[in-house]
Amino acid sequence: MTSPWAALAVLFTARLAMAFQYQVVASLGPLFMDRHGTNLADLGILISLYLLPGLVFALPGGGIAQRFGDRRVVASGLVVMVLGGLIMWQGQSWSLQILGRLLAGTGGVLLNVIMTKMVADWFAGRNLATAMGIFVNSWPAGIALALLLLPLIAQAGGLNAALATSMVLCIAGLALMTLAYRDPPASPGGTMPSGSWPRNSALTGILIAGCVWGLYNGALAMVFAFGPAFLVERGAALTQASGISSLVLWLAVISVPAGGLIGDRIRRPNAVLLAGLAGFAVTFALALLAPSLPVFILMGLICGLPAGPIMALPGRVLRPETRALGMGIFFTLYYFWMAVLPALSGALSEQVGSAAVAFQLGILLLALAALGTLGLTRHRAQAA
């Protein structure tokens, strides 16, 4: 396989399997609680455990890939995801569900860190924002697919059938990675030269880029985590509130790749990034003033625009020999912010007594992300 777009298709499929696996617990929560006699708090912990390993393994993941090769490490991550899925499928105790979830999330960390770097290797210098927009879209696409299919599969065959489906999708991603994927010609074997820790301007750039990505995703989390509660406070029924909030995710499947494509076409990805952040913040404000279906439709059509240009930032600040460890730094910051921000929002909402605080926090996070983007642009101009 020598086509960048064919390689991107393999990477997209593997990451889609990861998103599908992540969504299993949330989509089938009542079935997990019925089987294991747990409550919503336990379910929330099980959901969050998938991302928790990122705080530990994101940074070393880049070094591991540098030593053993990108494709081998990603394939190993998929094997760990399959093993975690197998434990959850066959495990009868809650402790085994926790173990399986942690293992699956550990494998997912390796995919997130290394495959992003692999996309940058294939598309460095051309169509990078477009490729990153498509690649990032695998996450909402996988979650949307899980929301659609898993309840139907569970209704027909029970919880085990749904868990097995997720595991089979991971196996399919593993097969594609081992049988169909090849490393880009510029990096045979998927390894990079030694001495690849980013330094000086590159280190500063990747630190800023990681914070921008984490803050942006934190703002998105405000919609999906607290949107239903906010709408219920404003008088919507729970089913209606959940449906409106999930619509943002479905529309993001369109806006995420669109942002990357537009940024590459007009050759101003940072302009698309900043406009998308500003537009997303405006929709938060509109939702606070007058929450309605059209506002959330507009939010879905705008909120994904910054994703591709943000994910293209590491490829622009890192040299090829620094990408492996640089992406580890990038995703360590992402996992940090994603661990802190939802908990912070929940605590603030509880203290104030309204989920509207989450949307106000979302505006602040987007403003900080925009300031970080402007700072990174100025930093790169000074370093040039």
Question: What is each of the regions a protein language model found here?
Answer:
Residues 133-181:
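Helix-loop-helix hairpin linking two adjacent transmembrane segments in secondary transporters
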Residues 100-138:
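Cytoplasmic helix-loop-helix junction between adjacent transmembrane helices
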Residues 67-77, 264-277:
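Cytoplasmic membrane-interface "Motif A"-like loop-to-helix N-cap segments
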Residues 269-313:
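C-terminal transmembrane helical hairpin of 12-TM major facilitator-type secondary transporters
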Residues 57-69, 255-267:
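Helix-to-loop junctions at the C-terminal end of transmembrane segments
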